Amino acid sequence: MVKLRLKRCGRRQRAIYRIVAIDVRSRREGRALRKVGFYDPIKNQTYLNVPVILYFLEKGAQPTGTVHDISKKAGVFMELRLNHQTKFN
């Protein structure tokens, strides 16, 4: 199973997180399947590669709580909902 979760980068007391698609059994700093964005909590900056995130979500990837909140603020789930509506109509 694949999860979308945060991978810690940066230096001590100055954490930056990459949002990655990674196997559930891998550790936090393990090898990721794909980098899909980053999150800087200090500067409050976020970059999300939305098409790649939508691809993984459609294939069954589960986001962690924090990644879910970040994606929700960016409107990723609205785009996912719109994609499903266009397929059925």
From Swiss-Prot:
Keyword match tRNA processing: no
A GO biological process held by the record: mitochondrial translation
GO cellular component term, pick one: mitochondrion
GO function term, MF aspect, one: structural constituent of ribosome
Localisation per UniProt entry: Plastid, Chloroplast
Keywords: Chloroplast, Plastid, Ribonucleoprotein, Ribosomal protein
Pfam family, one: Ribosomal_S16
Alphabetical list of InterPro entries matching this protein: Ribosomal_bS16, Ribosomal_bS16_CS, Ribosomal_bS16_dom_sf
Chief location: plastid
Keyword Chloroplast: yes
PANTHER family: 30S RIBOSOMAL PROTEIN S16 (PTHR12919), SMALL RIBOSOMAL SUBUNIT PROTEIN BS16M (PTHR12919:SF20)
Family that this chain belongs to: Belongs to the bacterial ribosomal protein bS16 family.
Protein name, UniProt field: Small ribosomal subunit protein bS16c
Native species: Morus indica (Mulberry)
